A protein has these predicted regions:
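N-terminal Lys/Arg-rich, disordered targeting/topogenic segments
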Residues: 1-9
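Catalytic cores of phosphodiester-bond hydrolases, prominently lipid phosphodiesterases
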Residues: 12-17, 21-383
Length: 383
C-alpha cells in the first residue's frame, strides 16, 4: 500500500512538473512570438501618439509645464544670479521608453518568480508614463536604449530593451522620439535643460537586420541628433566655449550659465564598447553631438565632462572630488525596479550628484504609485 501511494504521489508530482514545464514553454514561445512581431504595434502606437500630441499642442487649451512647482529654488532668480549648469540637480528616469510587457511575458515572469520563491525578480510589470508625460512632470533626464537596424545601407535606430523578448516601447523609432522631445520643447520654451542619456547595444541577436553599434553607426547617429534637434542641441562645442578641453573649462569653473542653456537638450553617450573610438574622432569632443559619459577613474582626462557613478554610496564618497573640486557632472541611480530601500534613497538624496535616476518617478498616469523625488522636487539647487 505504501509503495503504491509513493508511486501515485511521484506520478502526480511528475505530472505537475511536466504541466508546469509545458505552460512555461507555451508562455515562452508566445512571448517570443509576440515580441518578434511587435514592431508594427510599436510603430502604430508611436505614430498615433505623435498625432495626438500635435493636435493637443496646436490648440488654445495647452498650458506649458510649470516646472517652478517642482524646483526647490527660484529658477528665474537663479538665472539672473548666474547659476551655472553644473550647479543644479535634476531627477531622471531609467528605461524611459518602457511600456508594459506583453501579457504572456508578464505571466511567464510571474510564474517563474513564484516557482523560484522570488529568486528571479518580477520586473515584467515595469512601465513608465510616455516621454512627454515625464517631461510634463518636470523629469529632466531621460535614458533610452538603442538598437541599430541596417537593411543593406538603410540605417535606422530603434528604442527597445530587447528587440524580441521585451519589445514594448513608447518611442520605437529614435528619430521620432527626438521629434516628440523637440515638440514638447517647442511648446515649453525656456525649460530647464533636458539630459538625454543614450545606451547603445554592442551585442545584438542576428535577426531583423540588427547590427552591433559601431563607430560608423555612431557617426550616423550624430547626424540624426543634429537633424532632429537643430539649434535645440546643447552641444559639446557650446559648452566648451573658448576652452581647448573640458578639463581646462572645469579647472576655470566655466560651465555655461544656466540661463544660456534653458530650452536646450544635451545628449550623453553612455560608456560602451565604442566610447574610445568616438572620442578619437575629435579628442576635444568639440565636433561631436554627444558628451561621452565616463567613469570616476577617468576624471582627470582632458575630455571628461560627465561621469557615471551608478552606486549612490560611491557618489557620496566621491562627491567632494567629482562635483565640488573637479566640477564634473555626475549621474547616479537611486534604485532599480526590483530593488529599492530607504537607505539607498537617503544616499541618493544626499549624494550631491547632478542627475539622479529612478524607476519610481512622480507619475501622471498613476500618481499614487510609490515615488522617489529629490526631497519632494525634481529640480534642485546644489550651491
Amino acid at each position: 500500500m505504501t509503495k503504491k501511494l509513493i508511486k501515485t504521489t511521484l506520478k502526480a508530482v511528475l505530472g505537475v512538473c511536466l504541466s508546469l514545464v509545458a505552460v512555461l514553454l507555451i508562455l515562452l514561445i508566445w512571448s517570443y512570438g509576440l515580441g518578434f512581431f511587435y514592431d508594427s504595434n510599436n510603430i502604430k502606437y508611436q505614430d498615433e501618439h505623435l498625432e495626438y500630441l500635435k493636435s493637443e499642442y496646436y490648440t488654445d487649451t495647452y498650458v506649458p509645464c510649470d516646472e517652478q512647482k517642482m524646483a526647490d529654488f527660484d529658477i528665474e532668480k537663479a538665472c539672473a544670479d548666474g547659476v551655472k549648469l553644473n550647479e543644479i540637480a535634476v531627477l531622471g528616469t531609467h528605461n524611459s521608453y518602457q511600456r508594459l510587457a506583453v501579457f504572456p511575458k508578464r505571466c511567464l515572469v510571474t510564474l517563474v518568480n513564484i516557482i523560484t520563491f522570488g529568486k528571479v525578480k518580477n520586473e515584467s510589470t515595469f512601465d513608465l508614463d510616455t516621454v512627454t508625460q515625464q517631461l510634463e512632470q518636470s523629469i529632466r533626464n531621460l535614458e533610452i536604449d538603442i538598437e541599430t537596424v541596417d537593411n543593406e545601407g538603410d540605417i535606422r535606430f530603434i528604442v527597445t530593451h530587447d528587440p524580441i523578448f521585451d519589445n514594448a516601447t513608447t518611442c520605437y523609432d529614435f528619430e521620432k522620439a527626438l521629434e516628440e522631445i523637440a515638440l514638447w520643447s517647442d511648446h515649453n520654451p525656456g525649460h530647464i535643460p533636458v539630459y538625454l542619456l543614450i545606451e547603445p547595444k554592442g551585442e545584438v541577436p542576428s535577426v531583423k537586420n540588427m547590427k552591433p553599434f559601431t563607430i560608423d553607426y555612431a557617426i550616423e547617429f550624430d547626424k540624426v541628433i543634429r537633424r532632429a534637434l537643430g539649434d535645440k542641441l546643447l552641444s559639446p562645442d557650446f559648452v566648451l566655449g573658448e576652452y581647448d578641453s573640458f578639463k581646462e573649462m572645469r579647472e576655470n569653473d566655466s560651465w555655461p550659465a544656466l540661463k544660456d542653456c534653458m530650452g536646450k537638450i544635451a545628449v550623453l553617450l553612455h560608456h560602451n564598447n565604442i566610447t574610445d573610438s568616438y572620442i578619437a574622432l575629435d579628442p576635444s569632443i568639440r565636433t561631436q553631438a554627444m558628451f561621452p559619459m565616463l567613469r570616476f577613474e577617468h576624471i582627470d582626462l582632458p575630455y571628461t565632462s560627465f561621469i557615471l557613478e551608478n552606486d549612490p554610496a560611491a557618489a557620496v564618497k566621491n562627491n567632494k572630488i567629482s562635483v565640488e573640486e573637479k566640477k564634473v557632472i555626475v549621474r547616479t541611480r537611486a534604485d532599480d525596479y526590483s530593488s529599492f530601500s530607504d537607505e539607498k534613497y537617503e544616499l541618493a538624496e544626499a549624494c550631491g550628484s547632478n542627475i539622479v535616476s529612478t524607476d519610481f518617478p512622480p507619475r501622471q498616469v498613476r500618481p499614487k504609485d510609490h515615488t522617489f523625488t529629490l526631497g519632494g522636487y525634481t529640480i534642485r539647487l546644489l550651491k
